[in-house]
Amino acid sequence: MAQLSITVDQADALIDVARHIRIEGAQPGEAVEVTAETPRSGVLWRAQARFIADAKGTVDLRRDAPVSGSYAGADGMGLVWSQSPVASTSRELFNQPVTDALLTTLQASTGTAQAQASLSQQLAAPGVTRREVREDGLVGTLYLPAGAGPHPAVMIVNGSGGGINEPRAALYASRGYAAFALAYFKAPGLSPYISNTPLEYFEKGLQWLRRTVQPAHDFVALSGQSRGGELVLLLGATFAQQVSAVVGYVPSAFVHSGQNACDPQVGREGPTWLLGGKPLTHIWENNRTASWAPFDEGPSPHRHERAMRTALRDAEAVARARIPVERIQGPVMLLSATDDGSWPSSVYSQMVRDKLAEVQHPHDVQWLDFERAGHAILFPYVPTTQLVYAHPVSGKVSTGGGNPADNAHADAASWQGVLQFLERAVAAKAGAAQP
């Protein structure tokens, strides 16, 4: 009788690499229980699925759908993205520091036999270096790829949760980009709130990044999600000469107020961004139709996008607050979700795409709109089950929308799209620099 075993192709690899998991040695038609457990920042996350072995006594997770379990349908990485925290409400997906790999233990059981294997997900490839940045008034972390370079660069900004987006920076560096994760609030030495953030701070970040890494082809892209998606479009339009490309995850087409990340003394209808010391006009300002009621009222979890949609009915306020994306002087990528619970990123992205088409934007414009997905588009092969959360600044219990399976698809497809987009953008910049 064959011994039960689990094999994992590419058991130790970057987090964005799909693994091929197979179980062999079961009896034909036998039920096989498979579990996946991963400690994440001290909290155990777990998923499980029950399969029926084929005529050869094997289970192939890419080929076979579970008959029950944490996910449905054939999906080679389903046991990772369908994980939930055990006896915890944690939403922390990564270890601290993020350079510590995520180690998943796989266990298969038939009732009479057991097998175990593991897979390791790295955010930082071998040779990637990490450097904390606390200079020129900037707060962030710089990740550099292995090798001497020069490398094209990306500056990453977070959304309304604030802080330093080290996981995304580490993965960008692992894929060949000098990646600077720049905090602008809720980080050491910075305000705990998003209100009254000067755009000149980010210009200083762009200048520091160029001076420090001397990027290949002078290429510096911006990458941001949510409020950071709004921000990178705004920065691309404001400091156009300094921005080589823009990647906006679930972005806005408009300048918004402080919202959930506001300073309570300023209020959620107060300004977020300053330029030259003056607040930028935001969509809630003197808006005749905007109402917080659809977000505030009713039971938890709340959907912030319902309030955001009320502001779109005032055409004059919309026009005043629109980000002038036509001023961007490089390629633009937009990633949105049709069931975004935080704000209507699909509607916003279409507005941006349509404006760029209207002015015949001379650079590459890509828009990936993910059906049934929610606000939390990250990168491949992380859990997508925690849809409801308390906002990290306001504490308001909300839903980001979507569902685990479609959010997992968006995670995987978006990252491949972004890597291909940036590769084209770097090549275009390099070609333009040729004599």
Regions found by a protein language model. Give the residues of each.
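N-terminal cap/lid segment of alpha/beta-hydrolase-fold proteins
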Residues: T7-L14, R19, E24-E30, G42-W45, ...
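Acidic catalytic loop of the alpha/beta-hydrolase fold
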Residues: D339-W343, H375-A376
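Alpha/beta-hydrolase fold active-site loops
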Residues: H151-P152, P331, V365
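C-terminal catalytic histidine-bearing segment of alpha/beta-hydrolase fold enzymes
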Residues: V347-Q350, V359-P435
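Ser/Thr-rich low-complexity repeats and stalk/linker segments
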Residues: T35-V86
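Primarily recognizes the serine-hydrolase "nucleophile elbow" in alpha/beta-hydrolase
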Residues: G163-P167, K204-E285, R306-V318, R327, ...
